[in-house]
């Protein structure tokens, strides 16, 4: 069975590698030290510090595993290889809802780099799926669970 690939820009992959390094070199040793200290308190059956540290260790190890997989199966997307005005991973797109003055700016990223609060949307999201491949001036149909609406692509630029 073929492994899933994770489309991303080179910059996104580098960011994941930094996060992985931080987890391995800083967070993991901190958690191990917390476990060691909590063990020194004695009885582990009623030791909430120990339980919390073990839970954090499981979380950190899960993050490490996820990042290692995403990095190992990264598919680097070169946004320069796509037409300058075409929406793709690594591009920033400004859209305006048809019939309104509402504008939104999205940075199209691979799923590993998605952060809606920073305007970074995954290439797998419904909005990105509707926009990818379109060009400035095109109309895209956005289908969300609540509604369907149209947006016009106002501008497309390489994300800085």
UniProtKB/Swiss-Prot annotation:
Instruction: From the UniProt record, give one GO term of the biological process aspect.
Output: DNA-templated transcription elongation
InterPro entries the record matches: GreA/GreB_C_sf (IPR036953), TF_GreA/GreB_CS (IPR018151), Tscrpt_elong_fac_GreA (IPR006359), Tscrpt_elong_fac_GreA/B (IPR028624), Tscrpt_elong_fac_GreA/B_C (IPR001437), Tscrpt_elong_fac_GreA/B_fam (IPR023459), Tscrpt_elong_fac_GreA/B_N (IPR022691), Tscrpt_elong_fac_GreA/B_N_sf (IPR036805)
Q: Which Gene3D superfamilies match?
A: Transcription elongation factor, GreA/GreB, C-terminal domain, Transcription elongation factor, GreA/GreB, N-terminal domain
Report which residue ranges the record marks as coiled coil. 1-71
Query: What terms describe the molecular function in GO for this protein?
Result: DNA binding; RNA polymerase binding
Record's superkingdom?
Bacteria
Which keywords describe this protein according to UniProt? Coiled coil, DNA-binding, Transcription, Transcription regulation
Q: Which residues cross the membrane?
A: none
> What function does the entry list?
Necessary for efficient RNA polymerase transcription elongation past template-encoded arresting sites. The arresting sites in DNA have the property of trapping a certain fraction of elongating RNA polymerases that pass through, resulting in locked ternary complexes. Cleavage of the nascent transcript by cleavage factors such as GreA or GreB allows the resumption of elongation from the new 3'terminus. GreA releases sequences of 2 to 3 nucleotides.
Q: Which family does it belong to?
A: Belongs to the GreA/GreB family.
Q: What is this protein called?
A: Transcription elongation factor GreA
């Amino acid at each position: 069975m073929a492994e899933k690939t994770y489309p991303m820009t080179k910059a996104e992959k580098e960011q994941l590698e930094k996060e992985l390094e931080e987890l391995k070199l800083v967070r993991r040793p901190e958690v191990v030290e917390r476990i060691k200290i909590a063990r020194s308190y004695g009885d582990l059956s009623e030791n909430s510090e120990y339980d919390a540290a073990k839970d954090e260790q499981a979380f950190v190890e899960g993050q490490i595993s996820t990042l290692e997989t995403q990095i190992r199966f990264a598919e680097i997307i070169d946004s320069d290889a796509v037409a300058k005005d075409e929406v793709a991973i690594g591009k920033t797109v400004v859209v305006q809802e048809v019939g309104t003055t509402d504008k939104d700016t999205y940075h199209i990223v691979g799923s590993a780099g998605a952060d809606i609060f920073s305007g970074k949307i995954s290439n797998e999201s419904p909005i990105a799926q509707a926009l990818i491949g379109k060009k400035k001036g095109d109309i895209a149909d956005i289908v969300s669970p609540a509604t369907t609406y149209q947006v016009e692509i106002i501008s497309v630029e390489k994300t800085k």
